[in-house]
Amino acid sequence: MQRVIFDCNIYLQAAASSGGPAFACLEMAEQGLFSLVVSADILTEVRDVLNRVSVQKKIPKLTSAVANGFLIRVTEAANFVTPVPALITFDRDPKDQPYLNLALAAGASFIVTRDKDMLDLALEESEEGSRLRSAIPGFSVLDPASFLREMRARTEE
């Protein structure tokens, strides 16, 4: 089964809107169409972001109760990987390193994100992307809509 990692921004968007592609990605994980993979560090970041006062002011429906319910949903859908050794550095955005290291540790097929720095890993000229692709054959970084198209195409085969 394909292993997939969601960036924190995907969790935030899924928690904020049940009608968007990020939420549809989470639903696919809940349906068992792929294995959603997380680490303790990533779940801590997601919890912190969802409970930030500034985030909750921008997204009034994202109360602490909604955030906690969403986190329960994620933990029930996800598979935890421990330990996650620091095998790769990402100088362009060090905050993305936990996701890249989790991808290596889990042998992930995809990282789903809207983060430009991570999406640039898909570019052929990306040195970090090349290292990931050589370590994990078939590895891709996709935005949620592209990931949904990819998964739907695979399930139709």
Where are these regions (language model features)?
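Short, glycine/charged-enriched secondary-structure capping and boundary segments
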Residues: 18-21, 26, 51-52, 124-128, ...
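Short, well-structured N-terminal submotif of metal-dependent ribonuclease cores
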Residues: 1-38
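Active-site neighborhoods of divalent-metal-dependent phosphate/nucleic-acid chemistry enzymes
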Residues: 73-111, 116, 120
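Hydrophobic/aromatic ligand-binding patch that stacks against planar heteroaromatic rings
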Residues: 28, 102, 133
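Acidic, PIN/NYN-like endoribonuclease modules and their adjacent C-terminal/linker elements
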Residues: 106-110, 117-157
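PIN-domain endoribonuclease scaffold, especially VapC-family toxins
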Residues: 31-35, 40-85
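A short acidic, often aromatic-flanked loop/helix-cap motif at beta-alpha or helix-coil junctions
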Residues: 44-45, 87-91, 144-152
